[in-house]
């Protein structure tokens, strides 16, 4: 069951046998039976991020750009974009040095 604060209309959460508004601090008593109706359980999933690194096969089809490799100093690398975070965040730009093959990423 969900209960909203009568003062500010925000969600009230159970705390120490009472319902409490986290925004304005309004508290409301609950009965012993009622407290079971308002149990709060948080479920978080551990999502592991998989990142695909492009191997040397097929690199020649990727676009290139002039950027300095942090490992060898060469000034040309392949690049590609990949969504590695939430959809509402920008893509991650990956680079792979044409000379030494070092791969690094850049965030916007």
Curated annotation (Swiss-Prot):
The keyword Cell membrane does not apply. One of its GO terms (cellular component) is DNA-directed RNA polymerase complex. Zn(2+) 1 binds at residues 5, 8, 21, 24. Belongs to the archaeal RpoM/eukaryotic RPA12/RPB9/RPC11 RNA polymerase family. A zinc finger (TFIIS-type) spans 65-105. One of its GO terms (molecular function) is DNA binding. This is Transcription factor S. InterPro entries: DNA-dir_RNA_pol-M_15_CS, Rpa12/Rpb9/Rpc10/TFS, TFS, Zn_ribbon_RPB9, Znf_TFIIS. Zn(2+) 2 binds at residues 69, 72, 97, 100. CDD domains: Zn-ribbon_TFS. GO terms for biological process: DNA-templated transcription; regulation of DNA-templated transcription. It comes from Methanocaldococcus jannaschii (strain ATCC 43067 / DSM 2661 / JAL-1 / JCM 10045 / NBRC 100440). A zinc finger (C4-type) spans 5-24. PROSITE patterns: RNA_POL_M_15KD, ZF_TFIIS_1, ZF_TFIIS_2. The keyword Methyltransferase does not apply. SUPFAM superfamilies: Zinc beta-ribbon. Keywords: DNA-binding, DNA-directed RNA polymerase, Metal-binding, Transcription, Transcription regulation, Zinc, Zinc-finger. Pfam families: Zn_ribbon_RPB9 (PF02150), Zn_ribbon_TFIIS (PF01096). Induces RNA cleavage activity in the RNA polymerase. In its presence, the cleavage activity of the RNA polymerase truncates the RNA back to position +15 in a stepwise manner by releasing mainly dinucleotides from the 3'-end of the nascent RNA. The truncated RNAs are able to continue elongation. Involved in transcriptional proofreading and fidelity. Misincorporation of nucleotides during elongation of transcription leads to arrested elongation complexes which are rescued by TFS-promoted removal of a dinucleotide from the 3'-end.
């Amino acid at each position: 069951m969900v209960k909203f604060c009568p003062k500010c209309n925000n969600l009230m959460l159970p705390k120490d046998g009472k319902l409490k508004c986290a925004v304005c601090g309004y508290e409301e008593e609950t009965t012993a039976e009622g407290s079971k109706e308002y149990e709060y359980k948080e479920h978080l999933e551990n999502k592991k991020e998989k990142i695909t690194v492009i191997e040397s096969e097929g690199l020649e089809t990727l676009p290139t750009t002039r950027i300095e490799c942090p490992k060898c100093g060469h000034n040309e690398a392949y690049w590609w974009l990949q969504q590695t975070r939430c959809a509402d965040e920008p893509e991650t730009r990956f680079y792979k040095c044409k000379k030494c093959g070092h791969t690094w990423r850049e965030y916007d």
